[in-house]
Amino acid sequence: MTKKTRAKIPSPRERPFLWGIFLFAAFMLGWTACGGKLPEQDVVLYNRTASLPIGFYLRIPFAASRGDLVTYDPPEDVLAFSYAHGYMEHEKAIFLKRIGAMAGDTYGVDKNGNFYVDGNYVGPVSITDSKGKPLPQIERGVLHTVPEGEFLPLGDSTQSFDGRYTGTV
């Protein structure tokens, strides 16, 4: 008669090692699928600002449309302003925002500081940030049109430093 044996369940000390092997295998599989080359850009991003929900985001190329989350390199003056005011921890950073308006859409700030896209109210525009420092302003009372090849970035929070202050990118 053969003796039955019970399958060995990994101990709590062995589990991190097994997870490490699993993650390494998944990485190698993905790396091989990419032709053995690492991607030229970050694929996984972590957002720690309140302009969008805090957490990890996967960056993949796609044909973007209004409302989609996108990453982009902000213009140098916007990046310098963000760093100088403590919005970003590094002088070189990628922004993560939603596409609030696309080529041909209109946007503007009325005389009362309300921001609109295609005539729809989006939220208020502040003159100062939460620390009382002045924010850049787009001209009030003027209707702007998003140029071809550009978009207007908007965060989910009304306190997001985004296209309400910087215009299109």
Provide a role label for each language-model segment:
Residues 68-70, 105, 150, 156:
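Structural motif
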Residues 90-124:
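Mid-length scaffold segments of soluble, non-membrane domains
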Residues 74, 103, 129:
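Residues that line or immediately flank small-molecule/substrate-binding pockets and catalytic motifs
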Residues 1-94, 145, 164-169:
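Protein maturation boundaries and topogenic segments
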Residues 100, 116-127, 132-169:
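Beta-strand-rich cores of mature extracytoplasmic or soluble domains
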Residues 55, 112-113, 149:
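Beta-strand-connecting loop/turn residues
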Residues 75, 112, 156-157:
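Short, surface-exposed secondary-structure boundary micro-motifs
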